[in-house]
Regions:
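N-terminal glycine-rich anion-binding loops that anchor highly charged ligand groups
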Residues: 8-17, 45-55
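Conserved anion-binding
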Residues: 10-13, 17-27, 97-148
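Short catalytic helix/loop segments, enriched in acidic residues and glycine
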Residues: 22-44
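Glycine-rich, proline-tolerant flexible connector loops at the mouths of alpha/beta enzymes
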Residues: 51-70, 107
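Charged helix-capping and loop-helix junction motifs
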Residues: 66-73, 145-148
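Catalytic cores of alpha/beta
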Residues: 77-103, 118
Length: 148
């Protein structure tokens, strides 16, 4: 069975859309699944239309300009959420476990390979998703610049 896992980005408590990662130009998302860009309303519409899970990236948290963590927690009550909040280390991963079904470890924000190893040693594998970030056709493996 193929799982349907839609992806939304959050910025200032709204689902947003944009192109090419130019986050300052992102606009509120317009979708057939909801009448607004409210992430919980969108999660409800996605669930009614057969989504199995959803992937949410909190752009404010990733950019350290705020957060949408309560919106993520509420959406997770509607549909299981894989959450990308820009995990940097094992402590950050642990914090997010209360808010989502699975936590994304993005290689672009991770402090080191050792932090990823700590996470894999400490937490159930079914709660972990690794996102390998690529920019300019190169892997972005850890914010420290490490590559292994």
């Amino acid at each position: 069975m193929i799982k349907k896992i839609p992806v939304i980005d959050l910025k200032q408590h709204q689902a947003v859309s944009g192109k090419s990662g130019m986050r300052d130009t992102y606009q509120p998302l317009r979708t057939v699944f909801a009448t607004s860009s409210n992430p919980v309303e969108i999660a409800q519409g996605l669930k009614l239309n057969g989504a199995d899970e959803m992937y949410i990236a909190d752009l404010d948290l990733i950019e350290s300009v705020g957060h949408n963590i309560n919106d993520v927690k509420m959406a997770n009550t509607v549909l299981p959420v894989m959450f990308d909040g820009g995990v940097k280390n094992c402590e950050g991963f642990e914090f997010f476990l209360d808010y989502a079904f699975k936590i994304i470890i993005p290689t672009e924000t991770l402090e080191s390979i050792e932090e990823m190893e700590k996470i894999f040693d400490k937490y159930p594998k079914e709660r972990i998703v690794v996102s390998v970030d690529v920019k300019n056709n190169e892997d972005s493996l850890c914010s420290s610049g490490q590559y292994r």
